């Protein structure tokens, strides 16, 4: 394979690299990126990787991910690396790790949990109880959830 760039470099924004093959669209969904926001997003799927065999890459022009967003990506892409780009240069590089607390992003899978009651304005909250593999507990009903199950 030639050493050409499949997608041009971005001036400012975020590059999410080392996403397991086939999971880039799920990463975009987790980040709430649908394509209607006006952001330039480049998506490369199933490219060769020495580390993973095949991988996906997402480039988001004009948006830097928050630390919470970086770590929530670990739900579907535990091998991902996040690069923050400014003026075409990498200024920060992160490995994703499961967050200690997740608030308001996912629903509890327990149908009787108070967070699922339509008349209860309770924000779903989950606490990390195990890092490998990530396991969370609902702050309200005590049900355990693997991070990938919360998606």
Curated annotation (Swiss-Prot):
Its cofactor is Zn(2+). GO terms for cellular component: aspartate carbamoyltransferase complex. HAMAP family: Asp_carb_tr_reg. This is Aspartate carbamoyltransferase regulatory chain. The lineage of its organism: Archaea, Thermoproteota, Thermoprotei, Thermoproteales, Thermoproteaceae. The keyword Zinc applies. It comes from the Archaea. Involved in allosteric regulation of aspartate carbamoyltransferase. It holds the Pfam family PyrI. It comes from Pyrobaculum aerophilum (strain ATCC 51768 / DSM 7523 / JCM 9630 / CIP 104966 / NBRC 100827 / IM2). Zn(2+) binds at residues 108, 113, 138, 141. Keywords: Metal-binding, Pyrimidine biosynthesis, Zinc. NCBIfam families: ATCase_reg. Belongs to the PyrI family. The gene is pyrI. Contains catalytic and regulatory chains. One of its GO terms (biological process) is 'de novo' pyrimidine nucleobase biosynthetic process. One of its GO terms (molecular function) is metal ion binding. Binds 1 zinc ion per subunit.
């Amino acid at each position: 394979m030639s050493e050409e760039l499949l997608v041009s470099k971005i001036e400012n924004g975020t590059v999410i690299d080392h996403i397991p093959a086939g999971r880039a669209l799920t990463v975009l969904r987790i980040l709430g990126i649908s394509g209607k926001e006006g952001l330039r997003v480049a998506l490369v799927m199933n490219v060769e990787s020495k580390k993973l065999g095949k991988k996906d890459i997402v480039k988001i022009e004009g948006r830097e991910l928050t630390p919470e967003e970086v770590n929530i990506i670990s739900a579907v892409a535990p091998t991902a690396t996040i690069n923050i780009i400014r003026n075409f240069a990498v200024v920060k590089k992160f490995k994703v790790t499961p967050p200690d607390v997740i608030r308001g992003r996912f629903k509890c899978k327990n149908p009787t949990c108070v967070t699922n009651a339509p008349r209860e304005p309770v924000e779903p909250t989950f606490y990390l109880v195990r890092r490998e593999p990530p396991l969370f507990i609902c702050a309200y009903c005590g049900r355990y959830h693997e991070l990938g199950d919360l998606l």
